[in-house]
Design a protein with these regions (language model features):
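Active-site neighborhood of phospho(di)ester-bond hydrolases with catalytic His/Asp-centered motifs
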Residues: 7-8, 35-40, 64-70, 112, ...
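Conserved beta-sheet core of the metallophosphoesterase superfamily
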Residues: 160-238
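Active-site environment of divalent metal-dependent phosphoester hydrolases
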Residues: 13-15, 43-48, 70-78, 116-120, ...
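Short acidic, glycine-rich surface-loop motifs adjacent to enzyme active sites
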Residues: 141-156
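A short C-terminal boundary segment appended to hydrolase-like catalytic domains
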Residues: 231-268
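Charged helix-capping and loop-helix junction motifs
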Residues: 21, 49-53, 125-130, 161-170
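Extended active-site neighborhood of metal-dependent phosphoesterases/phosphodiesterases
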Residues: 51-134, 139-141, 174, 202-203, ...
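N-terminal active-site segment of His-dependent metallophosphoesterases
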Residues: 1-59, 75-79, 96-97, 131
Length: 268
């Protein structure tokens, strides 16, 4: 079993300093095997915000896998937005926009969905869908295949103002073909884990979707700052939401999932 700390939507530049300090302390104590950050490290992609984000990342337990979010693309600098949209991210955070991590139990691929002209809601490219299949094709059997992206592939409650990433159906088909079992994302600032069925999904329950809330941002959406602590194995995932209670992070909710007949099912 591996322990993964899944953080998202830090939004340095509009963040809670106390929450940031307590988060570092919590992770230092828990010592996860892997830290995954699914985008929006900054509020407005400014040099100063990226510098603070970089200093924060350097204090995290290693290894760390990071993907960008739409807030990591400059909003008001129009030239930079379209000519060098992720130049600052690549300078301060990570030059690799398709990071990959693998050990003897898991394989994790990160993709940049803050691309094209659709920064806000994101989009998966045809090349990225192909990469999902080609990268995981080389992963030995018996390892949990994980995809990390900023924009979710589906919304927990359809019909509201939240939208899935562009070309989500194409991406989900590629993931099913590649044997991806777990998807980590953020963007909505709301914690969620479970199945997100849809008419364009080949079969329900094949993929477990986990959304992280905002770890330290003051841009809250009806729930406290939080991150996910995952205990994962080839056929099981326990997702624990670690919420910020003003002075410390602690367990707020925990759900266990297991593969039953090739499909994820919540266990009592």
């Amino acid at each position: 079993m591996k322990t993964i700390a899944h953080l998202s939507d830090l939004h340095f530049g509009r963040h809670d300093e106390t929450a940031a300090e307590r988060l570092l302390g919590d992770l230092s104590e828990l010592r996860p095997d892997l830290v995954v950050i699914t985008g929006d490290l900054t509020q407005r992609a400014r040099h100063s915000q990226f510098a603070v984000a970089r200093a924060f990342l350097e204090k995290l337990p290693r290894p760390v896998i990071v993907v960008p979010g739409n807030h990591d693309v400059p909003l008001y600098d129009v030239i930079q937005r379209f000519v060098g949209r992720l130049a600052r991210y690549r300078r301060y955070i990570c030059a690799e926009l398709q990071p990959f991590f693998a050990d003897d139990e898991i394989a994790l691929l990160g993709l940049n969905t803050a691309r094209s002209a659709t920064f806000s809601n994101g989009r998966i490219s045809y090349a990225q869908a192909a990469a999902i299949k080609s990268v995981f094709a080389d992963v030995p059997a018996g390892r949990l295949r994980i995809l990390a992206i900023h924009h979710p592939l589906a919304v927990p409650v359809p019909g509201g103002d939240l939208l899935p990433v562009g070309r989500a159906a194409m991406a989900r088909r590629a993931m099913i073909e590649a044997g991806v079992g777990l998807v980590l994302s953020g963007h909505f600032h709301r914690a969620f884990s479970g199945d997100l069925p849809g008419s364009d999904l080949v079969a329900d329950g094949l993929i477990l979707f986990v959304h992280a809330g905002t770890a330290i941002s003051t841009r809250l959406r009806g729930e406290p700052n939080s991150y996910n602590l995952l205990r994962v194995g080839p056929e099981s995932v326990t997702c624990t939401v670690r919420a910020f209670f003003g002075t410390h992070f602690g367990d707020a909710d925990s759900v266990h999932y297991a593969l039953v007949g090739g499909r994820w099912a919540q266990q009592q």
